[in-house]
């Protein structure tokens, strides 16, 4: 029944975005692995007004269009697909992510598929990758591919990124590596990787942790055997179908002259069950704001996680106030997802502290 409900939810989301739905390809090559591709939209599925357009484009291609544009995919794997949504990734939320999770989980639980690929916009790709890495319970690989140029652009990067994602998902070398991101010949961890540049093709990096591997001359190569990152934890959300069951966690950004009442608004008016602070430096907050934060914590007892607004670095436990939690190496957007999963799982404050301490290596 859950499989049927998940399929119906996926179809509803896809229909609301005008996307074609589901296709099972009947002609199979028994010598090749089978991969299921999940389309969500993004630049990889976008069209511009001219071949030189690299901004101001709009989503207009389906996942089937993307597959048909790369005929050589048929040499790598048998392909089926599901169009989960067809929007820019800045419009994605748990209404889309939950059916995506269930679709991937069900595909990987089946003997029919060796792995899964997600086509996705790059704006929030790291959030989806992090979410899936913590929730998909399978040794089979999930590979997320996107593009920095629309499909109509001269030298569009999407087709090769999709080809490489299918190749990675179909490779036995990828077993046990969780969710991965692939763009621009790089294979990166879904747990660590972040979009570092708004425009560059070579934008997805984990500068401190490094890449997992690379794609060269039609070969998938990894630098080291499969290993889980420090702080990785599995969260069982197999019974989750209603997005409203995910607790609200709000990110607040540090700046000079910060209004300290923003956190009060987030909790009292918006119903936040947790707060992530994108602090300056190693997660610092204003003196006045810190006083308000502590008062709010004492009144409501909600977790407050200190992360950083810088592109990289760490917020160790000692850099957060005694009542708060340091995000370790996680940026604010990933800290938010981790905190939401902790809260959904019913973790108390000590358990949440322990989870985030693990990300720091503690």
Swiss-Prot record:
Its main location: secreted. Substrate binds at residues 89, 122-123. Its EC number is 3.5.1.1. Pfam families: Asparaginase (PF00710), Asparaginase_C (PF17763). Glycans are attached at residues 29, 93, 239. One of its GO terms (biological process) is asparagine catabolic process. Gene3D superfamilies: 3.40.50.40, L-asparaginase, N-terminal domain. The keyword Transferase does not apply. Residues 1-25 form the signal peptide. The keyword Secreted applies. Keywords: Glycoprotein, Hydrolase, Periplasm, Secreted, Signal. GO terms for cellular component: cell wall-bounded periplasmic space; endoplasmic reticulum; extracellular region; nuclear envelope; periplasmic space. SMART domains: Asparaginase (SM00870). It is found in: Secreted; Periplasm. It catalyses: L-asparagine + H2O = L-aspartate + NH4(+). Belongs to the asparaginase 1 family. Yeast contains 2 L-asparaginase isoenzymes: cytoplasmic L-asparaginase I, and cell wall L-asparaginase II. There are 4 copies for L-asparaginase 2 in yeast. The 4 identical copies ASP3-1, ASP3-2, ASP3-3 and ASP3-4 are arranged in tandem repeats located near a ribosomal DNA cluster. This is L-asparaginase 2-1.
């Amino acid at each position: 029944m859950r499989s049927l409900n998940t399929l119906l939810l996926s179809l509803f989301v896809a229909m609301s975005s005008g996307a074609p739905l589901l296709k099972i390809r009947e002609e199979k090559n028994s010598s090749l692995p089978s991969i299921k591709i999940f389309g969500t939209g993004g630049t990889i599925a976008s069209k511009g007004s001219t071949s030189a357009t690299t901004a101001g484009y709009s989503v207009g291609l389906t996942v089937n269009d993307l597959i048909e544009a790369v005929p050589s995919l048929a040499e790598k794997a048998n392909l089926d697909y599901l169009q989960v949504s067809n929007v820019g990734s800045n419009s994605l939320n748990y209404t889309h992510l939950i059916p995506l999770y269930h679709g991937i989980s069900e595909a990987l639980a089946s003997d029919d598929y060796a792995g899964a690929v997600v086509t996705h916009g790059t704006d929030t790709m790291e959030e989806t990758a992090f979410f899936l890495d913590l929730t998909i319970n399978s040794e089979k690989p999930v590979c997320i591919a996107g593009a920095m140029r629309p499909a109509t652009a001269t030298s569009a990067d999407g087709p090769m990124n999709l080809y490489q994602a299918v190749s990675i998902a179909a490779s036995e070398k990828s077993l046990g590596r969780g969710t991965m991101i692939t763009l621009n010949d790089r294979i990166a961890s879904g747990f660590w990787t972040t979009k570092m540049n708004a425009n560059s093709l070579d934008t997805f990096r984990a500068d401190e942790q490094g890449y997992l591997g690379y794609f060269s001359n039609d070969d998938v190569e990894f630098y080291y055997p499969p290993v889980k990152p420090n702080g990785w934890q599995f969260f069982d959300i197999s019974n989750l179908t209603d997005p409203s069951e995910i607790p609200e966690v709000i990110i607040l950004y540090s700046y000079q002259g910060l209004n300290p009442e923003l956190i009060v608004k987030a909790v009292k008016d918006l119903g936040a069950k947790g707060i992530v602070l994108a602090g300056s430096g190693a997660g610092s907050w204003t003196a006045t704001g810190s006083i308000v934060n502590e008062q709010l914590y004492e009144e409501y007892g909600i977790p407050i996680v200190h992360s950083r607004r810088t592109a990289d670095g760490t917020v160790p436990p000692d850099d957060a106030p005694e009542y708060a939690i340091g995000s370790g190496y996680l940026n604010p957007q990933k800290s938010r997802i981790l905190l939401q999963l902790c809260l959904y799982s019913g973790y108390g404050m000590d358990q949440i502290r322990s989870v985030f301490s693990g990300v720091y290596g503690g």
